[in-house]
Amino acid sequence: MVAWNVGVNAADAPTVDALATPFPLGCFTEKLKLSGAYRSVKKHLYVHGTVLPRESPFRVFYERAQAAGWSAHALACGHDVMLDEPEKTAEVLESLI
């Protein structure tokens, strides 16, 4: 069971565990090559699930998004915000339209 490790609600854990795949560690060790096309993106959004079993490693990304002027939202739920808070997640996404 991996779901408990990222703060998934107990009711959602079987679904998350069934859908989870091994995480590619290369994302931490390999350099990312960007084309520059990201500069043309006009709207930026970061959604942070704040309820985790320990200090969130994602909080720094939430804070960076806020500092950069992104639309940054903190939801009181686990890592899989779309499972824990589907209606709030939809509201946040629709706010960009």
Residue ranges and their predicted role:
Residues 50-77, 83, 88, 95-96:
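Conserved loop-alpha-helix segment in the C-terminal half of the alpha/beta-hydrolase fold
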Residues 24, 36, 80-83, 91:
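Residues in flexible loops and secondary-structure boundaries
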